[in-house]
Structures are given as C-alpha cells and as structure tokens.
Amino acid sequence: MHRAKIRISTIILLCLLFVPISSLTAQTKPDAPIPDTPAGKQLEGWLRVFASGNQDSFVRFIAEHYHKSLLDQDTAIDRAGGQARAYLDARSFEIRSIEKSTAQEIAVLAQASLTGLWFRLTMKVEAQSPYRITEYTRQRIHPPAGSQRKLRERELVREIKSFTDKLAAVDAFSGTLLVAKDGKPIYKMVHGMASKAYNVPNRIDTKLNLASIGKTFTAVAILQLVEQGKLSLTDTVGKILPEYSNKQVATRVTIHHLLSHTSGMGDIHGPKYAARISSLRQVRDYLPLFVDDPLSFEPGARMQYSNAGYILLGAIIEKVTGENYFDYVRRRIFKPAGMVATDYYETDLDIPNLATGYTNWIEQGADYQEFHLGPRRNTLHYGGIKGNPQGGPFSTVEDLLRFSVALRGYRLLSAQSLDLMTTKKIFFRKYAADDSYYGYGFELENINGQRVIGHTGGDLGVSSALEWFPDSGNYTVVVLSNYDRGGIIVIDKLQEMITLQLK
C-alpha cells in the first residue's frame, strides 16, 4: 500500500486488523455524544466531512482547520489522500465512548461502520480561537473485552461469507479467498472481475499477482542451498559474487542480512526503475538500479525492508546453481509442491486467466503516486513486465495452499530449516495493535497471544496474503486481490476471528 503522496521507493504496506460486523452489531452501544468543547467541535466537524466521502471536502477542511505546523509537514492534498484511503476502509466512524476530554484535547473509542474495526481517535487543538487542529491520530486497538462472541467452525464460515459479501457489495474487495484446516479447504470464495474491460469475472483458479509473497520462494531456495552445503548464512555477498562492484555491500553484507532485511540496502523503485520498466525481465537487469547505492546503516544494526536485497539473493541463487533463477524455482519449489498455475508470467503476453490489477493510485511523476477516490484504473502501464526474486509472481489460492502444505510437510525443506525461517530475527513494525517480526522470508506475528506466520504483499492493484495459524486449530488462509487493499482487509479480519473468536 501507499501513502497519500508517496515515493515508490518507500512503499509500505499499511495494514489494519478487522473484526466481524455481525458479531459486533448486537452488542455495540449507540454513538456517544461528543462534548461541546473546542476539541470536540473540531472532531465532530472532521467526522462529518469524513463520512461524506468527498475528497475535495477533505482538502478544504484540512486547509481551513489544520494548524500551519501540520501543513508544513504535509500539504492538505497529501493529507486528504490519506483520509481518502481511510475512507475506503471505514466509510464512517461511530463513537462508542469518550476516553478523554478537555478544552484542547479529545480521545474517543470508535468503530469503522464498514468493518466493525476499533480505533482510538485523538485530536488536539490550539489554545485560542480559531482552535486549529495541532494533532490528529487514528490508532488501531483491540476490541474491548466481551464485545465479540465465540464462533464454531460453521459459524466462522458464515461470518466470512457475510463479511466478504458486504465488502464486495460496496466494491471494496475483488479476488479469491481460501480457508483450510489441516491442509484441506473448508471454504472458497470469489468476487469481482479479472478484467473489467472484457467483463471477465474472477474464478477460483484465476491467477493473481502475489507481490511480496514471492519473497518466501526466494528464501526457501536459499535455505535449500544452505542445506546442500552450497551456501552459509554467514557468507558475504562478495564471497559468492566476487565481481559485485559495490565493495561496501560485498564485504559487509551476509546472506543472513539479506534474508532478514537487515543489510542496510534499499529499494529498486524510483526514476531508474521507471525508465527501464519495460526491459526488466531477468535478475541481472535489476542490478544496475541499486548497485551503486550506499548502505543506509551498518548491516545488522536494524531492519529496513529491502526489495534490492532479495533481488541480490536471486543473483546469488543463479551464481551458485548455474541456473536461471526462474528455472530453479520452478524445478525445486513449484514442481515438487504440485503448483500447476504459478509462474513469473510476462504480462505483455496474453496469458489465459490472468487477472488485471485495479488501483486508486495515480502517477504524478516517475517517483510519486497520489491516492484518489473514484473509479479504479487498471495497472497495465504501471507494473513491471515480469516478477522477480523480491515479488510479482502470479498464482492461485489453491496453488498457494499446495505450497504451504508442501513446506510444512517438509517436502521442500527440513524441519530444522523451516523452524529457522520462522523464528524471529528482527522487529519489523507495529502491526495494528500488535508487534510484527521478520524471520527469513516470513512475517511473524503474535495476535491475541497466538502465532500467525506467513507473508503479505501489496503494490498498485495488488493485495495478497498467505498465513497459517499453528496455535489456532491449524488453519491456513490465502487471499488474493486485484485491488490495492481488498486482500489486506480480508486477511486482517480473519486474523481477528481465528485468534480471538474461534472456539
């Protein structure tokens, strides 16, 4: 996902946890009255404008009511783009309780009307008239204790169907979903169009873009080579690629650093990427995009999500095996896992049953995007021609379940290697109300005290997730969407349902 005005080189997937509407509706309170204070009046005005869904109104309200100190950081147009993104996820907020209220500050607990998602909304204003807004935050929180009823598996399936039907009815989701228990599907769902231009609906076997889920394939390939004794996690880039011209990277960055996003390397996107996008088909084509970039910090010091690092892992796989990266992954991962529809398809070819992405982001230059409400645009001219070691293969929900079953059944890696991949290596980010960590090619979360393991993906017209729940009945969830946020909305809701509500 993206910010309101965003450098493609700093695309960050913004994620929220969702809760089931039908489980909450009967137990929620009516809107709490907002206090008649300067802060309360500003919040009430903001809520009214937000619920209008009019982006021009967002801009006007922000320009007139936000303090100059905030507008100096981000313009009214930039901030309105962020509010537009939030609007698509929430539609409006229903105030459930007042947590704090003074003349200059108000904090409320609220639910998003579309999803039932809980937030803490905080607003501060200046001390004198006209009481402009000096701070506004929207923080995801866990549902209050007792606000959700427990579900049996049959009820879980009904809740999922009800929720996804509601999202599809307002065009918030397009794509496919599969839920499995013990590796066997218990629910499949399809909504939306694979091609709006040709009126082709999505099918359960439609191939959709995975974005960064593809990093798991690269990580598995590297761990296979470690098992074979062809690589060590402590090997430096220069040991494997002595010709790599960036000596800072070659001498200080190890395989461990690349896998865990702790190398200090950055992204591949930017003006260079935009200028060469139609010619990027092989791993070697990507190296000039970042080979001269300095490290942002000493390797191992902290985490910085790095697409460039995973491209470099692809180059290492090619050097060690003497094989094209794509051929290796097909032979050693896709084929043994039984994945019959997954590949790094070239999108300028007419591939049957391949979904087109649709986005609310509009290019405003080679390295900038702005988010706009209104009709989504197809991404035929935005995305790359072909996926690569950091992401972008196409697959189906059924194929990704096959991958999960093969990986967890130790057909691709040993139990020791899988445990190594799915053990916390570094703090990743604050994910909604919980912390998220990174292993080797896997995101590791602890949601409501239960482990969630997998990977998400996001790009223009792409949102995807593959996750399993080892402490919660051994469920696996695969969701693929050809909308910017559709897949994330669904996976976040299912995380909450499975870890908090399932009996």
Model-based region annotation:
Residues 100-148:
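Exposed beta-sheet edge and beta->alpha loop/turn motif
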